[in-house]
Every structure is written in structure tokens, then in C-alpha cells.
From Swiss-Prot:
Taxonomic lineage from the root: Bacteria, Pseudomonadati, Pseudomonadota, Alphaproteobacteria, Rickettsiales
Protein name according to UniProt: Small ribosomal subunit protein bS16
Family named by the database record: Belongs to the bacterial ribosomal protein bS16 family.
A molecular function GO annotation: structural constituent of ribosome
HAMAP family found in the cross-reference section: Ribosomal_bS16
A GO-annotated cellular component: small ribosomal subunit
Any one biological process term the GO annotation gives: translation
Provenance organism: Anaplasma phagocytophilum (strain HZ)
SUPFAM superfamilies for this protein: Ribosomal protein S16
Length: 96
């Protein structure tokens, strides 16, 4: 199973709102997801409250177990909008 971190589109016509989700790559864009880890609102000014929010701990976990971010999610990480906490699944499992 190939797992992707991607955007799920919500909102009305011409007023998009996206959830940042972890989903199987074979599932359709707005289909079933494994976990919701944040949201992105392109209608709000960049950097303003409510523009983007992500659970960095869960993002770090999913990146650690091999989930591949899509181009847009990778762009958020590279630009510094998302701070991914470094941590692998092995270190998380040892803590539990």
C-alpha cells in the first residue's frame, strides 16, 4: 500500500478549503482517508491565522514510516509553512 500525504478538497464552488490528510494513493481525492492531520485555506492571506494548520508530530510520524507528500504538501514544507518534527516510527514505538 502506497501512502500519500495530500490535500482533500472541501468547500463550496469557487471557495475551496482543503484538509491535509494521509490516504492510500489508490483512493480518490475526496475519498476515505487514514488520518486527517491539518487544513489549508487558500482564501485567507498567506501567514494569517487560519491559513494553514498541521499537527507536526503526526506529520513527522507519517514521513518517518515512509508516506510520500504530494507536490503541494512538499512545497509547504520547503517554504517553512509546515515544521515537520523529525522522528521515525521506530523511535515512537520504543517510547510507547
Amino acid at each position: 500500500m502506497s501512502v500519500k500525504i495530500r490535500l482533500m478538497r472541501l468547500g463550496a464552488k469557487k471557495k475551496p478549503f482543503y484538509r491535509i490528510v494521509v490516504a492510500d494513493s489508490r483512493v480518490q481525492r475526496d475519498g476515505k482517508c487514514i488520518e486527517q492531520i491539518g487544513f489549508y485555506n487558500p482564501m485567507v492571506e498567506c501567514g494569517a491565522p487560519g491559513f494553514l494548520k498541521v499537527n507536526a508530530e503526526r506529520l513527522g510520524y507519517w514521513l518517518g514510516v515512509g508516506a510520500q507528500p504530494t507536490d503541494r504538501v512538499s512545497w509547504f514544507i520547503k517554504k517553512g509553512f509546515i515544521e515537520a518534527q523529525s522522528g521515525s516510527a521506530a523511535s515512537t514505538a520504543q517510547e510507547a
